[in-house]
Structures are given as structure tokens and as C-alpha cells.
Regions:
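Metal-cofactor-dependent catalytic cores
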Residues: 1-233
Length: 233
């Protein structure tokens, strides 16, 4: 079976849920459209929207530390500026282009702050051309990288550990079928075609504790980074 793309996903807000995409237009140096365009900065984070600089992911709310974020279903409509958040029995939809809308979003997410920051508010932040990818701290080019996931490799790990692994744990933009398992480890500095778009393998994704979180239960149930080390070596 020839390799093919079977899933396209963007994550409008860093650390929050995925939005499936039927198709996307990729352009050199611009990353995956609409991906990680927003983030929830911690109360002590001095991120400046007028002069954005890439910061470590620990400066923002993230699944690696706040696994409860996985219970949220979010959607962003660029045309209206509306960010919708569903948390089990309660929901919120606000226009984040307005100060009041952002203030309400900030207040909603206050409960997800770590204990040492309780009583304060996170800030929903964004900046034109800025992407809140984890690897953005390494270079401007990596800030706009597109993340790809080989589903054959995911199944290989599943078989070895005897547990189901939802591919959404890995928060990739592009899901690919039809490849040999772990062939992606050979893609560094190689040209890769996504449809008519030529990409180049930049680096292997270093998996963090966010992958430990089950997207269905919002609990940590598998030490994925450790299992990957065992499977790959």
C-alpha cells in the first residue's frame, strides 16, 4: 500500500484539543495553518504580544503538567474570532478579539493553574506570525515545523506493550499510513513530499509527559516516553 495522509489536525490553542481539517494549504516557512496560534500564558509569564519571543513550554498551560486540560473540547472559528470550550456539563463561547472575551476565557482557565499560582489568572496570548510550538525555542524555522506521525510505528508500540495508544496522544498535524514502522527515523535532512508540497525532515520529535495522558479519560495511564525508548532501542 502506498503511503498516504489519513488525518490532518491543527491545535489552535497550545495544550488544548485538536481540530480535524479536510485539507490545508502549506506554504514555505509558515507551518501548519492555524496551529498553535494561541497559548495560555502562566500568570508569571511576561510574553509580549507586541514583541513575541519563543518561550519554553513550561511558561504556558500544557498537558505535560495539567492533564485535566484533556477533558476539554475546544473549537476556534477564525472568521468570527469565537473560541468555544466544552467541559463536560458546562460550556463557554467568547470572542477573543475583544478584551471582555479574553478576560472571560482567562477566568475560565484559572482553575487549571498549578496550586502555587491559584488566585491569579492565565493570559490568552497570540501574535501575528508566531507559533507556540515546543521546538520554537530552538530556531524560527522549527517554530513553523509541521509534525508528522507514522501510524505503523504507533501500532508497533501498541503490540509490544499490549495496550491501545490513541494517535492523538502525540498531537501531530499529519497522520500517515502505508509506511514501514520507524522509517521516519531515517527522514532527517531528507526531502518528503506531502501531496505537491516538498518538506525536509528537520528533527525527531522528543516525546514529553503529555503523551502519558489518555485523551479520553484525562488521566495519566501509560509512560509513553519510557515505552518508546524501549521499543526504539
Amino acid at each position: 500500500m502506498p503511503a498516504k495522509v489519513v488525518g490532518l489536525f491543527r491545535y489552535p490553542v497550545k495544550g488544548l484539543s485538536a481540530e480535524p481539517q479536510a485539507s490545508v494549504d502549506l506554504h514555505a516557512g509558515r507551518g501548519f495553518p492555524g496551529d498553535r496560534a494561541f497559548a495560555l500564558a502562566s500568570p508569571t509569564n511576561a510574553f509580549d504580544e507586541a514583541a513575541p519571543v519563543a518561550l519554553r513550554k513550561t511558561e504556558f498551560l500544557m498537558l505535560a503538567r495539567q492533564e485535566a486540560l484533556a477533558r476539554l473540547q475546544t473549537a476556534f472559528d477564525p472568521a468570527s474570532g469565537h473560541l468555544s470550550v466544552l467541559d463536560r456539563t458546562r460550556s463557554l463561547t467568547k470572542d477573543i478579539r475583544t478584551p471582555d472575551g479574553r478576560a472571560d476565557i482567562n477566568a475560565f482557565f484559572a482553575e487549571f493553574l498549578p496550586d502555587d499560582q491559584k488566585g491569579r489568572l492565565p493570559r490568552l496570548v497570540t501574535a501575528p506570525g508566531h507559533c507556540f510550538t515546543d521546538v520554537g525555542v530552538h530556531s524560527p524555522e522549527l517554530m513553523h515545523a509541521v509534525s508528522m506521525l507514522n501510524l505503523a510505528s504507533v501500532r508497533d508500540v501498541e503490540q509490544r506493550i499490549g495496550k491501545h495508544l490513541d494517535p492523538h496522544r502525540f498531537r501531530a498535524n499529519v497522520l500517515i499510513e502505508g509506511l514501514e514502522r520507524w522509517v521516519e527515523n531515517e527522514w532527517l535532512d531528507r526531502d518528503i513530499m506531502l501531496g505537491a508540497v516538498a518538506c525536509k525532515g528537520a528533527r525527531l520529535t522528543r516525546r514529553c509527559p503529555a503523551t502519558e495522558v489518555n485523551p479520553d479519560t484525562a488521566t495519566r495511564d501509560i509512560n509513553v516516553p519510557q515505552e518508546l525508548m524501549i521499543c526504539m532501542w
